[in-house]
UniProtKB/Swiss-Prot annotation:
<keyword id="KW-0227">DNA damage</keyword>
<feature type="binding site">
    <location>
        <begin position="89"/>
        <end position="90"/>
    </location>
    <ligand>
        <name>NAD(+)</name>
    </ligand>
</feature>
<feature type="domain" description="BRCT">
    <location>
        <begin position="610"/>
        <end position="689"/>
    </location>
</feature>
<dbReference type="GO" id="GO:0006260">
    <property type="term" value="P:DNA replication"/>
</dbReference>
<dbReference type="InterPro" id="IPR001357">
    <property type="entry name" value="BRCT_dom"/>
</dbReference>
<dbReference type="GO" id="GO:0006281">
    <property type="term" value="P:DNA repair"/>
</dbReference>
<dbReference type="Pfam" id="PF03119">
    <property type="entry name" value="DNA_ligase_ZBD"/>
</dbReference>
<feature type="binding site">
    <location>
        <position position="319"/>
    </location>
    <ligand>
        <name>NAD(+)</name>
    </ligand>
</feature>
<feature type="binding site">
    <location>
        <position position="437"/>
    </location>
    <ligand>
        <name>Zn(2+)</name>
    </ligand>
</feature>
<keyword id="KW-0235">DNA replication</keyword>
<dbReference type="InterPro" id="IPR004150">
    <property type="entry name" value="NAD_DNA_ligase_OB"/>
</dbReference>
<feature type="active site" description="N6-AMP-lysine intermediate">
    <location>
        <position position="123"/>
    </location>
</feature>
<keyword id="KW-0862">Zinc</keyword>
<feature type="binding site">
    <location>
        <position position="416"/>
    </location>
    <ligand>
        <name>Zn(2+)</name>
    </ligand>
</feature>
<keyword id="KW-0479">Metal-binding</keyword>
<feature type="binding site">
    <location>
        <position position="179"/>
    </location>
    <ligand>
        <name>NAD(+)</name>
    </ligand>
</feature>
<keyword id="KW-0460">Magnesium</keyword>
Amino acid sequence: MQNIDLISEEEAKKLLEELADKIAAYNHAYYIEDNPLVSDSEYDQLFNTNLKLEQKFPHLVLENSPSKKIGAKITNKFAKITHQIPMLSLSNAFDEQDVRDFVDRIKNFLRLDEFAPIFCEPKIDGLSFSAIYKNGLLTTGATRGDGYVGEDITANIKTIKNFPHKIDNAPEFLEVRGEIYIEKQDFLNLNKEQEEQGRDKFANPRNAAAGSLRQLDASITAQRSLKYFVYSGGVTEQNLASSQEQLLIKLKEFGFSVNEISKLTNSEEEIFTFYEYLKTNRENLPYEIDGVVYKLNDFALQNRMGFIARSPRFATAHKFPAIIGRTKLLSITVQVGRTGTLTPVAELEPIEIGGVTVSRATLHNFQEIMRKDVRIDDYVFLQRAGDVIPKITGVDIGKRPNDTIAFDTPLFCPSCNSKLHYAPEDIIIRCDNGLNCPAQNYERIRHFVSKNAMDIEGLGRKQVEFLIDKGLISNPLDIFFLKEKNDSSLTKLENMDGWGKKSVENLFKNIEQSKNVSLPRFIYALGIRHIGEQNAKLLAREFGSYANFIAQMELLSKNDLDIYQKLNDLEGIGDKILVDIIDFFDVKENTTLIKKLGEVLNIEDYKETREQSSLTGKIIVFTGSLPTISRAEAKATAEKLGAKVAASVSSNTDLVVAGVDAGSKLKKAKELNIKIIGEEEWLTLIKNV
C-alpha cells in the first residue's frame, strides 16, 4: 500500500474508488455469503487506509464509502425487516495507544476532567441479531443485514435452546440485540457430521453459526447447537436502565443469557488488565472471541456522544493479535481476474490455526513474492484472525531446503497463453487478451450477474462454469436467450447434472426479473476496469439515460475532446480511469455487446433521490469556543441533521455559529452578510428541527 503522507490527490481518488469496491465485495462475502475472502487483519488494514485517506482528503469522500456502510446488502431469500435504529458496527482499536486515544476522545468530546467509567465485554465471533417482543411475546427475529434492513429469521431464532419465547413482567414493547454463536466442540461435531454426509465443511465457528441460522428450513437450524448472548436493548434499552451495567442485570432478570465475563472499569489500567486476562484465557473459553468491546457505561453520556455514519462514538472493539502458524508451501497457483489481473495464491500443507484448517493463503501480487522471497517447499508463517484465506507474513529460512529456487514470474497467461503485460506503477501483471481469455470471460460473466450488478440469483460460480463448459453461454447477452435455447434443445437443462425442474424455473424467472435494471447497475455490470459502483453512479448521473451514455461513450472512443474534458472534470474520474473507459469502448466487440444488451433490457433512466429537512444540505461553519458544548459535539449534531460542516467561510456558507473569541471567520461572515448565531440560538434551532 502506498505511503499516505506522500500520495497525490489524483492517486487518492483512484485508491479510494478501488478500496470502496474491494471492501464492498469483502463485506458481501462476510455478511451475506458467510464466506470471508480475506483475513480480519487485512480487512482492517484496508479499512484504516480508507479512513486515513478520507481524513487527509475529506473532499474526496465517496457516497459509497466503506466508512459510511455497516454490513452488506441483504439477499432475497428472507423477508426484509427494517431496524428502528441502525445496528451499527464498531470502530477498532489495535493497541493500547488506540484505546488511550478512544478514552481521550470521550473526555474531549464531553469536556470531562476525569475518567468516565467504561464497561468491558468479550467480543463474540458470531452473527448479530435483533429480537422484538410485544406484550412479552417474541414476535420478530432479524439479522443485522446491512445495518438498516435485516432478514426475518423469527422461525429460526425460536429453535435456539433457552431463547425466551415469552417474558414475564416485560414492557409492552421490548427489543434485545446480541450475538448468536456455536461453541468450539459443537463446531467440530457439526463438521464431522458434514464430512460424513458428503457435504462441505464450515470454515470456522462464525460461518457455521451464520449458515445454520440463515436456513430456509428452520428444522435444520433446530438440529444445530446454537447459543446466544444479549448485550443491548436496541431502541428500548434506555427505557430499561441508565447504564450498560444495569441493562445487563435487567436483561438477565427477564431470562436472557448475558455474558458474565464482563467488567465495569474506572481507569485505563483496569481496562488493560481485563484485556490481558481475556487474551490469556481465550483458548480456555468454550466459544470464540476476537477481542474486547469497550462502551461508555452511562447512557446519558452515550446520547451526547452520538454516532458517525458507521459506528457509535461511545464504543470501540479492541482486537486481539492475529494467530500465527507455520506450514509448508506446496505450490503457487495463479488466478486471472475479470480485468486480466493475475493474482498468486499459495497452496499449503493443511494446518489448523485457532480451530480452523487452512490450506490456502493469499500472496497478493508478484512483488510481494519477491519481497518476501517465498519459494515452493518453504515453510511459511501464516497470520490468521477469523479468516478463511490468511496472509503469509514471512519464511522460516532456517528450514529452507538447499534445492529451492526463486519463483519465476510468469511471462504468459495461464488461461489463454498470451503474452502478459507488466504495469510496474500498479504493482500488477495483466493479461490483455480480454474476452478471448477464458478466465477473464468467465470472471466477466460472474461479475455481470453478481448481486450489485444485474443481481441474477441462481447463477453462482458453479452454474456459470457449467453453462460455459456446455456451450450454453459465452457472453452476458447469451444469458437472456438461455430459456429460448433450452426450449428448442433436445437435452433440457433440468435433466443435466446439478439441475432440476425447480432450480431451472427459478433461474429463468430471476433472469426475466433482472431485465429491469437501473442505469448505474447496468454500467457497473459491464465490468469496465476501475468503474466500481461509485463511478458507475457518477457516469449515470452525468449522462442520465442509456441512449445518451452509449452515444457519448462512442464519441469518447473517437477522441472527442469535449466529452473527455467533461468527464475529466467529474470528481472521482481522472486521466487514468478515462484511459480505461476509452480502452474498453475501443474494442468493437464490447460496443456491439452493449448495444445488443440495450435491445433486450429495460434500462431505467438515472433518478436522484435525496431526503430533505430544514438543515439538509446547509453549509455551516463553527468558530470560537462554545460555552457548554464542544465543537466536536456541535459538528456531530449538525451532520446528524443533514448539514455539511465546513472549515472556512465562503459565499456558499449558509450559517455561522460563533462562540467566544471568534476571529477571522466571524469577520468574513459579516463582510459576506452571512447569518450569524450564538450557541444558545443554535441549541434552540436544533431542538426545533
